[in-house]
């Protein structure tokens, strides 16, 4: 018998999960002898959260924002205190931020400080409307915080960075 798993996720993860699910299905069968088929459901993160909260049967849910997971939590499908299981009451998710630069990296962009320079433009979605862009914003904030900068200095860096967004 083949086991079916429904993975409800947000749009930008479609291709990632297509590749990952194929590898996982093969791995699972090799390890257990059991066949598994993963069914994907993709859409906007907020829409997917509402679908699950309103009854879409999901075995795995991966969404862009903690608020979307909270929508599911509010419907009592997961423990309302789920964030308390993680450091700093954080969302259980990671995201890797990559800087794509012109061929040869003519401006020698290496880290977040370089994105603050006046000769650099940043292309990213708007953090007010995009879950992925919020991760970008948080990654930048964490970078500056990790260097021990004050909240005031970090806020100024973030204002400068947002002005660079296109």
Where are these regions (language model features)?
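Ligand-binding pocket segment of bilobal, Venus flytrap-like solute-binding proteins
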Residues: 147-166
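A conserved helix-loop-strand patch within extracytoplasmic ligand-binding domains
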Residues: 73-146
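Short, surface-exposed, polar/charged, turn-prone segments marking secondary-structure boundaries
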Residues: 33-38, 65-70, 88-93, 126-129, ...
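Soluble non-cytosolic domains of exported or imported proteins
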Residues: 14-18, 63, 106, 127-134, ...
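Solvent-exposed amphipathic alpha-helical surface segments
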Residues: 27-31, 143, 147, 151
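Early extracytoplasmic/lumenal segment of secretory-pathway proteins
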Residues: 1-75, 85-86
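Short, flexible loop segments at the rims of nucleotide/cofactor-binding pockets, characterized by
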Residues: 39, 101, 163-166
């Amino acid at each position: 018998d083949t086991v079916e798993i429904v993975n409800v996720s947000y749009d930008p993860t479609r291709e990632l999960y297509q590749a990952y699910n194929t590898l996982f299905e093969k791995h699972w069968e090799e390890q257990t002898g059991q066949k598994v088929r993963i069914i994907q459901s993709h859409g906007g993160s907020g829409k997917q959260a509402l679908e699950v909260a309103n009854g879409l049967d999901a075995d795995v849910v991966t969404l862009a924002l903690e608020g979307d997971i909270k929508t599911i939590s509010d419907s009592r499908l997961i423990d309302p205190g789920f964030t308390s299981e993680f450091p700093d009451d954080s969302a259980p998710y990671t995201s890797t931020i990559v800087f794509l630069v012109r061929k040869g990296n003519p401006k020698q962009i290496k880290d977040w400080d370089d994105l603050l320079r006046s000769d650099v433009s940043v292309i990213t979605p708007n953090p007010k409307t995009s879950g992925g862009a919020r991760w970008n914003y948080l990654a930048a904030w964490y970078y500056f915080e990790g260097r021990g900068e004050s909240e005031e200095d970090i806020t100024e860096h973030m204002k400068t960075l947002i002005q660079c967004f296109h």
